[in-house]
Amino acid sequence: MTAVSIRRPIRILGIDPGLRRTGWGVVDSDGNRLVYVACGSVEPRDTLPLAERLLAIHDGLAKVLAAHAPAEAAVEQTFVNKDGAATLKLGQARGVAMLVPAMHGLLVAEYAPNLVKKTVVGAGHADKTQIQMMLKILLPKADPKTADAADALAIAITHAHHRGAAQRLKAVGA
């Protein structure tokens, strides 16, 4: 007698952190099958002090988690640019983006921007237009209103793709 494995879809939250706009996207993943659930962005007012903007990102993402109940989350890694102060502020937004799902007990994975692009488009230096075109193919029902929401969906897709490979490696003891 063989054991029957009942595979269930897993709900994944992708997050593209930013101080002006933090994109989020939710997909259900069942093996190679992806189903669009929702996407949007948290947009704190530019006039708020930094601490209040971070709080707005926290509260917005907490509402997304409450509304969509993801099982896992993925966040894009921060790239370092020439403006050190801007990089530090983006890092603070990214910290909040990682903290909120972790506070809800979720696994939080991190992916480099080039890996996200390579996974979704097939090229590590793809532009935002190419990502949005591939999203229409991979998630036909998705209609992200911002590039940040589209990027967040791409991050969720990347996690769906790579989590399976990581689980297979773990299963064989690699």
From Swiss-Prot:
Q: What is its EC number?
A: 3.1.21.10
Where is Mg(2+) 1 annotated to bind? D16, D148
Q: Where does Mg(2+) 2 bind?
A: E76
Instruction: Tell me the cofactor note.
Output: Binds 2 Mg(2+) ion per subunit.
Superkingdom, natural source: Bacteria
Swiss-Prot/TrEMBL cofactor(s)? Mg(2+)
Q: Provide the Gene Ontology terms for cellular component.
A: cytoplasm; Holliday junction resolvase complex
Q: Which InterPro entries match?
A: RNaseH-like_sf, RNaseH_sf, X-over_junc_endoDNase_Mg_BS, X-over_junc_endoDNase_RuvC
Gene Ontology molecular-function annotations: crossover junction DNA endonuclease activity; DNA binding; magnesium ion binding
- Which SUPFAM superfamilies does the annotation name? Ribonuclease H-like
**Where is the catalytic site?**
D16, E76, D148
Q: Which Pfam families does this UniProt record tie to the protein?
A: RuvC (PF02075)
Provide the reaction this enzyme catalyses. Answer: Endonucleolytic cleavage at a junction such as a reciprocal single-stranded crossover between two homologous DNA duplexes (Holliday junction)
- Note the PROSITE patterns from the entry: RUVC (PS01321)
Q: Does the keyword Flavoprotein apply?
A: no
Entry keyword set: Cytoplasm, DNA damage, DNA recombination, DNA repair, DNA-binding, Endonuclease, Hydrolase, Magnesium, Metal-binding, Nuclease
Q: Which GO terms describe its biological process?
A: DNA recombination; DNA repair
**What is the annotated localization of this protein?**
Cytoplasm
What is the role of this chain?
The RuvA-RuvB-RuvC complex processes Holliday junction (HJ) DNA during genetic recombination and DNA repair. Endonuclease that resolves HJ intermediates. Cleaves cruciform DNA by making single-stranded nicks across the HJ at symmetrical positions within the homologous arms, yielding a 5'-phosphate and a 3'-hydroxyl group; requires a central core of homology in the junction. The consensus cleavage sequence is 5'-(A/T)TT(C/G)-3'. Cleavage occurs on the 3'-side of the TT dinucleotide at the point of strand exchange.
Q: Which NCBIfam families match?
A: ruvC (TIGR00228)
Similarity section: Belongs to the RuvC family.
Q: Which PANTHER family did the record assign?
A: CROSSOVER JUNCTION ENDODEOXYRIBONUCLEASE RUVC (PTHR30194:SF3)
The subunit field of the Swiss-Prot or TrEMBL record says: Homodimer which binds Holliday junction (HJ) DNA. The HJ becomes 2-fold symmetrical on binding to RuvC with unstacked arms; it has a different conformation from HJ DNA in complex with RuvA. In the full resolvosome a probable DNA-RuvA(4)-RuvB(12)-RuvC(2) complex forms which resolves the HJ.
The name under which this protein is listed is Crossover junction endodeoxyribonuclease RuvC
Organism of derivation:
Rhodopseudomonas palustris (strain TIE-1)
Q: What is the lineage of its organism?
A: Bacteria, Pseudomonadati, Pseudomonadota, Alphaproteobacteria, Hyphomicrobiales
